[in-house]
Amino acid sequence: MEITDVRLRRVETDGRMKAISSITIDGEFVIHDIRVIDGNEGLFVAMPSKRTPDGEFRDIAHPINSGTRAKIQEAVLAAYEVADEPAVNEESSADESVVEEN
């Protein structure tokens, strides 16, 4: 599995979310709404999730092994570090910056 494209949009919120990302896997499959979160021990990647009726959050898509999770996190955080556009307000419709990985 190779991450062939990362699109990232920085957001400015009062919370800990710093960016929203989409990744393309092998040029054939896209996962949207991957979030970059500023956690207690630094930045980390949160997979897309949905709130259940009982208030619990469940991942919609997620890697099933630690190696794949590491690949996704490394690719998204690398795109976050090189994104040179300024943060935008979450409500605005800014274009996404694109970082391609091969």
From Swiss-Prot:
Family (UniProt): Belongs to the SpoVG family.
Record key words, sorted: Cell cycle, Cell division, Septation
SUPFAM superfamilies: SpoVG-like
Native source species: Listeria innocua serovar 6a (strain ATCC BAA-680 / CLIP 11262)
PANTHER family assigned to the protein according to its UniProt record, in alphabetical order: SEPTATION PROTEIN SPOVG-RELATED
Functional description taken from the UniProt entry: Could be involved in septation.
GO biological-process terms attached to the record: division septum assembly; sporulation resulting in formation of a cellular spore
Record-given protein name: Putative septation protein SpoVG 1
Xref: Pfam families: SpoVG
